[in-house]
UniProtKB/Swiss-Prot annotation:
Cofactor(s), by name: Mg(2+)
PANTHER family tied to this protein: HEPTAPRENYLGLYCERYL PHOSPHATE SYNTHASE, PTHR40029
Protein name: Geranylgeranylglyceryl phosphate synthase
Keyword Disulfide bond found: no
Cellular component GO terms held in the UniProt record: cytoplasm
Family, similarity comment: Belongs to the GGGP/HepGP synthase family. Group II subfamily.
Length: 255
């Protein structure tokens, strides 16, 4: 197992870091850590060390419910030793921290509530400017099960088998100038985004795809990667079975 060098400063360089890897045809993995579900600093240190050592490319920090600013800062601080980016995955404007390397600046494109499409972003923008957090413009699109994120975000979820609609959203995001499209099946979803949807989208758009939700095995992750997913996100499996998460990361990084 290769231990990677620590303490490379990434503030202001996260988008370049990610794009350089993608341009080298790497497939990436993000580890989603929910501060609300972390029971102790010892647990977080153990999980983070193992995920880092097998090659996860970034830590995403965030959750839909129960995350305070203090807990967010605490988790980011504990991850500070690792050279990979610490990226905020915000559910609302309370999840902003100057300690992070970057922020996914999300717009929930298929929400029926304008607040989640552009309202929260307007409120957050001056704060982000003041805190000098690097932003990564990302279209967030919820598919299938959707979970808590769909409920809170009032999303009109895209059916798992409606490839044309998912492609239309992806193209809209590309034309709006987004850097990424994040297709989300929802935390703990009974099934992930279908590989057929990803390959269908990739025939029409070259925008990098982040895929998350319902990914519980290396076999599923590899099918998504083979279909064209650029970045795989796992969260629940990290909390439930870190050894399975490690296998997923190894599979993706050895692809």
């Amino acid at each position: 197992m290769k231990i990677r060098k620590k303490k490379m400063k990434l503030k202001g360089k996260v988008k370049k870091y990610l794009m350089d890897k993608l341009n080298d045809n790497e497939k990436l993995h993000f580890s989603l850590l929910d501060p609300f579900k972390i029971n102790s600093s010892e647990e977080l240190k153990y999980i983070a060390k193992n995920l880092y050592n097998v090659g996860t490319d970034a830590f995403l920090i965030g959750g839909t419910l129960g995350v305070s600013k203090d807990k967010l800062d605490f988790v980011i601080s504990l991850l500070d030793d690792y050279e990979i980016p610490k990226i905020i995955f915000p559910s609302n404007i309370n999840l902003l921290s100057e300690k992070a390397d970057a922020l996914l600046f999300l717009s929930l494109l298929n929400s029926d509530d304008i607040y989640y499409v552009i309202g929260a972003q307007i409120v957050a923008a001056p704060i982000i400017k003041m805190l000098q957090i690097e932003v990564i413009p990302t279209a967030y699109v919820i598919v299938g099960h959707g979970g808590t994120a769909a409920h809170i975000g009032k999303a009109r979820v895209i059916p798992y088998d409606n490839f044309e609609l998912a492609t239309a959203y992806t193209l809209a995001a590309e034309y709006l100038g987004m850097d990424f499209v994040y297709l989300e099946a929802g935390s703990g979803a009974p099934e992930p985004i279908r590989p057929e949807m990803i390959s269908f989208i990739k025939k029409a758009s070259s925008i990098p795809l982040i895929i998350g939700g319902g990914i519980r095995s290396v076999e599923v992750a590899l099918k998504l990667v083979e279909a064209g997913a650029n970045i795989i996100v796992t969260g629940n499996i990290i909390e439930r079975d870190v050894d399975k998460a490690i296998k997923i990361i190894r599979g993706i990084k050895n692809k």
